[in-house]
């Protein structure tokens, strides 16, 4: 059989059929089937039947193929596809009965029976292509002749035959029910054709033209032929369905007798027969409950098919490091396949807000801090204001417990509450983030209740000068010199009959506050506390987030940053990746809300990155900044030798001087604070950041961007054998003095001996243990920032805050500060493009400029790499002594390997 043989081609197409390519391959299959001859057509039908036996789950595809090729084979070769299928069906049954009677040890009865029952289901589903006597023959051939005497001795084969009848009639039941509709349809066709015939005869009486008479005669003959054919077909169908109904009634009498005696049939077979009777009595319509379940599952599959690729893609991108989130999602998906949970599933998949407020019955999925901060209520922690008096849908808040600055007066925007419960007109005039519908018309700062802890009796020392409702105002000193005295130390608020409280806000109160809340029945809207905040050591992370969320006062910016850094530095080794993401999300959220303080929040991000690299500024120290700043040259340069006239006491170092380990490293010259660039005038090109593309020598860390030979060459590397001042051992004599040369005087030798008394010998330093290799922190702030930019969680927060311009400015500044590189910058730009967000003209302009700058820088880096590769290919080396590029010298010829070398003309004796 050649490869171009039509049967071979059709068989290969049949083997390739799957769910994805079925619609494409079935057209090719039908077109190739027209090229088959009679024998090949028979072989092809046999191949389809064998495919059904091997792959019963794909029987629906083969049924459609049979319906397509049946008229082709019938017209070309007068081959009935149904007859061939029935022949193969009977052969398969004969093989099965022979195996049962042979009693072979290797024969598996259960698997063979299940395979044949799947074949019966297939034959019932493609009933239209089968001969009309198929079901009648099934009843006559497989109905066991059971009587009262022989009923107790039913064999496995007889039980299998009962299952064959039940399976065949169950799958072909809708066709049997179509008998009534079929007959009515033919009656309608009869009346319709009779009306047409009468109209044609009327038309003959009115019209006397010969041509019309001829046409009408032809029409009448054709219609009468159609009527006769339809009548013959309807009679055959009536006889056919009557025969099926009679055979089914005969089978019903036997099967009902077997059902009445419970001991005769196994439970599974008995319920199968009962299901057949229920379908017959219900006109072969599936019961409503089962039908609804099937329809619901079909709709679930349809929705999952439409959204499956998007879900799988998003899960693979966002659940790489979190396997529990992926498990929870698919577990909730498969649990929701029932009817009751289907609406929850559909809402979870189709509603845009499904990831914000998951239902209480479904498992709680941890949200990203960026998504949590982009919600309507942006607090990552639970809050509850117990001193709210809500009677008759009114809100009253007492502010007696808060100590407020004179410059920060809240009394303009806050109404004092009265203890009278009948006062139903009191109002709340300050805004509670975006969740409150009450607007504040006064131009005063508002309290941000976004990050309030859920611990009621927790007392935390807040940094001085920052208003945060996490604790009472009296616990923290104020910025201004004029401070209001606390009004009352005890608040006795009796809140009774509060039945309509829909929003509950909790603040930490002091131990003197006595609050009684009775009959609070409808407290609905509560937000769970962030797991990152609750698991923080000593709850200092909550304080840090509160300081970040607090308002920045212009004269106190440095104090604001200093307080945050002094809280984070002691927790540097304890902070984990989720807690760092929480801090970063708080910074970026406030960067969106307070665009005028963008530079302060950006500088805070850079300071956190420098802290992990040990490049922290001296202003942020562990003791609150009391350590004086250390100049750079004092760290790197060696101390100069003392003059001869200096005393020995001047050379001594003060004992027990506190040393900050974070101040050992200097501030890198290649990274400059963005605040200095924003607040100061732009300096020269050599002192600028990575802000211009045309500067050839600004990026000495990344290499030159110009095409010329670099004018600046790095210093020569130190060799291991090069002696240095530190590694040269001092020659110590018996008196503890260094041996002086013959030209040195006695005064200089005495002074040098006095100075060396306090110097530790190098032998002691050699005995110290070697420091372990520093393992890089995989969860540093820089890595957390990069990973946060790689997905679209942070981008969605900027989009919901309508601060895409801030997002693009942040990307540009992070690139200038050597924190992100060109590939990540291009990926962030592609996330904006793929999100299909509605951008303003300004945002579109900034996005195009950013993309153009990234592409240009990428091209320059490629050119630089090509030039470096070209230099290495030209065999040029740099001479450190002359500071010039020279050609690499040729390697000397090898020594002669024999007694006579023609290349060297030298005889070796």
Curated annotation (Swiss-Prot):
Species assigned in the record: Dictyostelium discoideum
Keywords for this protein: Coiled coil
Phenotypic consequence of gene deletion: Null cells are arrested at the tight mound stage but accumulate the bright yellow pigment characteristic of mature sori. Although these mutant strains do not form fruiting bodies, many of the cells encapsulate within the mounds. Sporulation occurs about 6 hours earlier, accompanied by precocious expression of a prespore gene, spiA. However, the spores are defective and lose viability over a period of several hours. Unencapsulated cells also die unless they are dissociated from the mounds and shaken in suspension.
Disulfide bonds: none
Organism lineage: Eukaryota, Amoebozoa, Evosea, Eumycetozoa, Dictyostelia
Free-text function comment from the UniProt entry: Plays as essential role in regulating terminal differentiation.
The protein's name in its UniProt record: Yellow mounds protein A
Domain MIF4G: 7-283
Pfam families xrefs: MIF4G (PF02854)
One GO-annotated biological process of the protein: anatomical structure morphogenesis
Molecular function GO labels: RNA binding
Domain of life, per lineage: Eukaryota
Entry-linked InterPro entries: ARM-type_fold (IPR016024), MIF4G-like_typ-3 (IPR003890)
């Amino acid at each position: 059989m050649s490869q171009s043989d039509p049967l071979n081609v059709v068989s290969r197409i049949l083997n390739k059929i799957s769910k994805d390519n079925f619609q494409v391959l079935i057209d090719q299959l039908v077109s190739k089937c027209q090229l088959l001859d009679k024998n090949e057509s028979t072989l092809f039908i046999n191949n389809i039947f064998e495919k059904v036996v091997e792959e019963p789950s794909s029987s629906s595809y083969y049924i459609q193929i049979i319906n397509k090729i049946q008229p082709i084979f019938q017209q070309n070769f007068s081959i009935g596809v149904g007859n061939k299928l029935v022949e193969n069906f009977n052969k398969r049954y004969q093989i099965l009965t022979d195996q049962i009677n042979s009693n072979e040890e290797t024969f598996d009865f259960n698997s063979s029976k299940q395979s044949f029952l799947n074949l019966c289901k297939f034959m019932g589903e493609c009933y239209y292509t089968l001969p009309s006597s198929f079901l009648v023959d099934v009843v006559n051939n497989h109905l066991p002749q059971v009587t009262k005497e022989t009923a107790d001795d039913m064999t496995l084969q007889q039980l299998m035959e009962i299952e064959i009848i039940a399976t065949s009639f169950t799958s072909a039941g809708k066709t049997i029910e179509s008998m009534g509709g079929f007959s009515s349809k033919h009656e309608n066709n009869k009346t319709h054709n009779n009306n047409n015939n009468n109209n044609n005869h009327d038309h003959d009486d009115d019209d006397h033209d010969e041509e019309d008479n001829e046409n009408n005669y032809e029409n009448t003959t054709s219609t009468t032929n159609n009527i006769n054919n339809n009548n013959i077909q309807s009679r055959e169908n009536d006889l056919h369905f009557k025969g099926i109904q009679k055979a089914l009634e005969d089978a019903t009498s036997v099967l009902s007798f077997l059902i009445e005696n419970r001991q005769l049939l196994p439970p599974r077979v008995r319920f199968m027969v009962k299901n057949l009777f229920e379908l017959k009595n219900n006109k072969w319509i599936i019961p409503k409950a089962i039908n609804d379940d099937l329809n619901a599952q079909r709709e679930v599959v349809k929705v999952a098919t439409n959204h499956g690729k998007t879900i799988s893609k998003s899960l693979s991108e966002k659940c790489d490091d979190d396997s529990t989130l992926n498990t929870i999602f698919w577990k909730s998906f498969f649990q929701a396949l029932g009817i009751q949970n289907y609406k929850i599933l559909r809402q979870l998949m189709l509603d845009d807000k499904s990831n914000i407020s998951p239902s209480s019955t479904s498992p709680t999925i941890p949200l990203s801090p960026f998504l949590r901060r982009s919600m309507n209520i942006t607090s990552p922690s639970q809050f509850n204001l117990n001193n709210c008096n809500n009677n008759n849908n009114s809100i009253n808040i007492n502010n007696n417990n808060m100590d407020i600055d004179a410059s920060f007066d809240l009394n303009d925007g806050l109404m004092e509450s009265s203890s009278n419960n009948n006062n139903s007109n009191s109002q709340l005039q300050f805004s509670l983030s975006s969740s409150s519908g009450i607007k504040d018309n006064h131009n005063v700062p508002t309290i941000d209740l976004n990050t309030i802890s859920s611990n009621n009796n927790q007392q935390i020392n807040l940094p001085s000068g920052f208003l945060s409702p996490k604790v009472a105002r009296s616990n923290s000193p104020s910025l201004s010199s004029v401070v209001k005295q606390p009004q009352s130390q005890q608040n006795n608020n009796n809140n009774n009959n509060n039945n309509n409280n829909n929003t509950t806000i909790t603040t930490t109160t002091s131990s003197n506050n006595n609050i009684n809340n009775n009959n609070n029945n409808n407290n609905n809207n509560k937000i769970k506390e962030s797991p990152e905040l609750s698991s923080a050591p000593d709850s200092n992370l909550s304080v840090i987030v509160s300081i970040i969320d607090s308002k920045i006062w212009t004269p106190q910016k440095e104090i604001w940053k200093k307080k945050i850094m002094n809280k984070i530095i002691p927790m540097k080794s304890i902070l984990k990746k989720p807690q760092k993401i929480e801090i970063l999300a708080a910074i970026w959220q406030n960067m969106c809300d307070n665009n005028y303080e963008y530079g302060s929040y950006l500088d805070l991000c850079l300071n956190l990155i420098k802290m992990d690299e040990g490049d922290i500024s001296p202003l942020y120290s562990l003791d609150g900044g009391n350590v004086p700043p250390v100049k750079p040259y004092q760290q790197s340069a060696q101390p100069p030798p003392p003059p001869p006239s200096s005393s020995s006491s001047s050379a001594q170092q003060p004992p027990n001087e506190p040393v900050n380990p974070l101040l050992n490293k200097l501030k890198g010259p290649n990274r400059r604070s963005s605040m200095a660039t924003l607040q100061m005038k732009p300096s020269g090109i050599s002192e600028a950041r990575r802000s211009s593309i045309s500067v050839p020598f600004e990026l000495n860390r990344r290499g030159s961007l110009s095409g010329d030979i670099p004018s600046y060459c790095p210093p020569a590397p130190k060799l291991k054998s090069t002696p240095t001042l530190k590694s040269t051992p001092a020659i110590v004599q018996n008196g503890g003095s260094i041996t002086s040369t013959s030209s040195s005087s006695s005064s200089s030798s005495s002074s040098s001996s006095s100075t060396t008394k306090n110097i530790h010998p190098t032998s002691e330093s050699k005995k110290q243990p070697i420091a372990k290799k520093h393992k890089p922190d995989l969860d540093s702030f820089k890595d957390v920032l990069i990973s946060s930019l790689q997905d679209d969680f942070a981008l969605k927060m900027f989009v919901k805050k309508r601060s895409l311009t801030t997002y693009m400015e942040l990307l540009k500044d992070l690139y200038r500060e050597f924190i992100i590189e060109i590939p990540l910058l291009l990926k962030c730009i592609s996330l904006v493009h793929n999100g299909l967000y509605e951008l303003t003209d300004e945002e579109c302009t900034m996005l195009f400029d950013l993309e153009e700058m990234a592409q240009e820088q990428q091209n320059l880096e490629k050119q630089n790499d090509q030039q470096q590769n070209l230099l290495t290919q030209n065999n040029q080396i740099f001479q450190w002594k002359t500071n010039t590029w020279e050609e690499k010298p040729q390697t000397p010829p090898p020594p002669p390997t024999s007694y006579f070398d023609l290349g060297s003309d030298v005889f070796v004796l």
